[in-house]
């Protein structure tokens, strides 16, 4: 049958029908009906399976096309009001809207909404760089700039009011002199007329009348007749206010809005610029700069979508070149009171180190108290011991090798900013310095003061760190700032002199291991407690939906507030010269930098890790101050010397966790720390009597003295909420 059907097809030249045509399908179905039942069944089953698969493909493609058509019809224009998850179609591309704070940014719909490249490379790389991990950084920056800006705007307003009052006083004085000159001229004219017409008897009365009227009109600020007679001008324009007696002249400057300008030097998507414009109410202008034209186009797109074209100016160019263009500007023209072209705030948030931008930034920000915000994400350089040569070339100092490396990194960054500014007679004042996750963020005020710059050498230190032994350290200032009485004996002045040679040897006095050198680095305070407190005071007023990281901000700023130990009181009776209002004392040095970790110390002497509260209680009972550092959990910051810290650790081991015999060998750091190198008699005496304080008192682990038991639960040290919590990869390709 099959052979006959094939021969019949060739004889009549019937083409083989494709399965996608309905007519051919009908023809084949008719032929199958003529065939044997079994052959008909097998042929029909295969045919209809094939037709069904094709129909499914057609159905899927049709549904996709319909979905795309529906999405195209639902897509909104760039001018639509921004909203979360909004679909925007612009210039042939589709975008999805992401909200952070009060700003909205557009990301390509083809890419992931919250991009995060895993080590396996599962997700697509970004075409527009957006890192949601740094929302904490951006939230904190908005609050810090707002706290700084409120004070800066108030300072500008006070200076402007003072200038207006000075100009107004000069204008009033000139007006009085003109009025007096006019009055004297009228009186003289009236006296001459009276002498010529009526005689001397009537001159006195007429003169008194004219003089009285003139004084009355002058007091009211009107004097229309006199002004008309003397100048010949019409008197319709008001020159005074008869109700309150205050003069209003065109020469007196009127109150104006204070300018507040911000530079987002490395803007990427423009998210920071958008947030600063939306969330800082007194911001008048924000410049969003980026090197790549693709990034600038993205910035313009986001600015247009957020309807902020009047506030944000996008610039395509090198950030260093852009900032150097403002280097020659002065903050204020003393003769004409011209506003400065320099920025009030410059935000540096690069991918990696900010070191190449610092020299230009300190010259482009206002030098009468401008704010510099700096982020450095290269913690592998300034907080590790792997690249000391790279750290020195970028920050001018060597990193610390040890548990306190992150605080050392902050001080290296501040040292780089301070040394860059000092070349131009600029002094820095750190307001807030934080080590966060994988990056550092510092907020620094810049002001012109060659006198304050002289303190920099005495606020710069090197660190001798026993990183291979017990972990102790010693600091050494490069110079000394000494307070001396002046020649009259009624005042004092600061004298800047050389420091002594290194006061410590190459070996650690506690364990005998070799020390390593770190620095030079910043030795001044890391924070301004008043500035930090102002931010904390604003947190309860914030909308938690807008600022989603306020819980962590509160915890970290509370730690920053607590870790700032006040300097010790002066031992002499000399009174330092007064510090200008609004400035920090340039002579203050952080006498107690860095911290120690009880778990690390217990590892040295091979004992059970002591309770943090017990160690703090022992230090407090001995009269020392204790707090903790924001850089790492489990840290203790204190003004106690390392010699006493090891006394506390030895006493803890003696009372609570005796060391097993043979656990510490003579080649270990703990051998000398525990006093095992001393004679047997001395060891036995110490074991019986225990450690004593410097005053000969017993060491007591007074846990009841510790008041930092968390009554209010704060997120002081956040655990990474998900995997791959880091800086992410650079953006690739056009948006």
Residue ranges and their predicted role:
Residues 2-4, 11, 27-48:
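N-terminal chloroplast transit peptides
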Residues 10-11, 16, 50, 55:
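Intrinsically disordered, low-complexity polyampholyte segments enriched for Lys and acidic residues
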Residues 20-22:
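Compositionally biased, intrinsically disordered low-complexity segments enriched in Pro/Arg/Gln/His
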Residues 33, 47-50, 55-735:
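SAM-dependent transferase fold signal centered on methyltransferase-like domains
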């Amino acid at each position: 049958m099959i052979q006959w059907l094939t021969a019949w097809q060739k004889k009549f030249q019937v083409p083989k029908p494709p399965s996608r045509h309905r007519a051919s399908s009908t023809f084949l179905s008719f032929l199958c009906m003529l065939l044997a039942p079994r052959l008909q069944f097998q042929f029909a089953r295969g045919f209809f399976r094939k037709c069904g698969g094709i129909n499914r493909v057609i159905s899927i493609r049709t549904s996709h096309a319909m979905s795309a058509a529906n999405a195209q019809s639902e897509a909104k224009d760039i001018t639509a009001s921004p909203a979360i998850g909004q679909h925007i179609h612009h210039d042939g591309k589709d975008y999805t809207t992401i909200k952070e704070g009060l700003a909205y940014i557009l990301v390509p719909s083809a890419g992931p909404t919250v991009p995060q490249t895993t080590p396996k490379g599962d997700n697509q790389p970004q075409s527009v760089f957006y890192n949601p991990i740094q929302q904490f950084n951006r939230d904190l920056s908005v609050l810090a700039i707002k706290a700084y800006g409120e004070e800066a705007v108030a300072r500008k307003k006070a200076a402007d009011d003072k200038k207006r009052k000075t100009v107004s006083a000069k204008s009033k004085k000139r007006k009085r002199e003109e009025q007096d000159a006019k009055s004297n001229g009228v009186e003289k004219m009236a006296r001459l007329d009276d002498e010529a017409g009526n005689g001397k008897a009537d001159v006195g009365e007429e003169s008194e009348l004219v003089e009285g009227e003139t004084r009355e009109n002058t007091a009211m600020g009107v004097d229309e007749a006199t002004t008309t007679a003397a100048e010949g001008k019409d008197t319709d324009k008001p020159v005074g206010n008869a109700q309150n007696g205050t003069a209003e002249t065109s020469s007196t400057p009127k109150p104006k809005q204070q300018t507040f300008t911000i530079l987002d030097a490395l803007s990427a998507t423009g998210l920071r610029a958008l947030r600063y414009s939306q969330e800082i109410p007194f911001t008048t202008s924000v410049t969003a700069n980026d090197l790549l034209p693709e990034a600038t186009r993205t910035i313009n797109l986001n600015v247009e979508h957020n309807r902020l074209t009047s506030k944000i100016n996008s610039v395509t160019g090198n950030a260093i070149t852009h900032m150097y263009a403002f280097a020659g500007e002065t903050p204020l023209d003393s003769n004409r009171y011209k506003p400065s072209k320099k920025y009030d705030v410059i935000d540096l948030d690069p991918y990696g180190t900010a070191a190449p931008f610092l020299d230009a930034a300190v010259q482009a920000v206002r030098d009468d108290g401008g704010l510099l915000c700096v982020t450095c994400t290269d913690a592998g350089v300034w907080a590790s011991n792997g690249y000391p040569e790279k750290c020195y070339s970028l920050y001018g100092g060597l990193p610390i090798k040890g548990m306190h490396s992150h605080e050392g990194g902050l001080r290296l960054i501040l040292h780089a900013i301070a040394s860059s500014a000092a070349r131009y007679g600029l002094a820095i004042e750190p307001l807030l310095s934080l080590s966060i996750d994988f990056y550092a963020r510092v907020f620094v005020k810049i002001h012109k003061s060659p006198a304050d710059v002289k303190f920099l050498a005495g606020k710069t230190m090197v660190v001798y760190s026993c990183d291979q032994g017990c972990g102790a350290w010693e600091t050494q200032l490069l110079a000394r700032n000494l307070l001396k009485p002046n020649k009259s004996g009624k005042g004092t002045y600061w004298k800047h002199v050389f420091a002594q040679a290194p006061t410590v040897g190459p070996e650690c006095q506690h364990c005998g291991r070799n020390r390593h050198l770190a620095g030079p680095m910043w030795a001044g305070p890391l924070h301004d407690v008043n500035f930090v407190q102002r931010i904390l005071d604003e947190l309860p007023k914030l909308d938690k939906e807008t600022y989603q990281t306020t819980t962590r901000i509160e915890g970290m700023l509370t730690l920053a507030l607590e870790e700032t130990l006040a300097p010790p009181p002066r031992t002499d009776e000399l009174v330092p010269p007064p510090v200008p209002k609004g400035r920090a004392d340039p002579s203050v040095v952080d006498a107690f930098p860095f911290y120690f970790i009880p778990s690390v110390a217990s590892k040295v002497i091979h004992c059970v890790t002591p309770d943090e509260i017990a160690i703090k209680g022992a230090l407090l009972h001995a009269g020392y101050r204790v707090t903790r550092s924001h850089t790492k959990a489990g840290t203790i910051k204190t003004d106690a010397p390392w010699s006493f810290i090891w006394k506390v650790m030895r006493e803890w081991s003696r009372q609570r966790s005796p060391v097993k015999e043979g656990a510490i060998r003579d080649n270990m750091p703990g051998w000398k720390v525990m006093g095992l190198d001393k004679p047997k008699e001395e060891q036995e005496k110490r074991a019986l009597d225990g450690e004593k304080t410097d005053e000969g008192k017993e060491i007591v682990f007074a846990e009841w003295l510790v008041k930092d038991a968390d009554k209010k639960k704060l997120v002081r040290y956040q655990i990474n909420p998900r995997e791959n919590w880091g800086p992410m990869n650079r953006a690739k390709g056009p948006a």
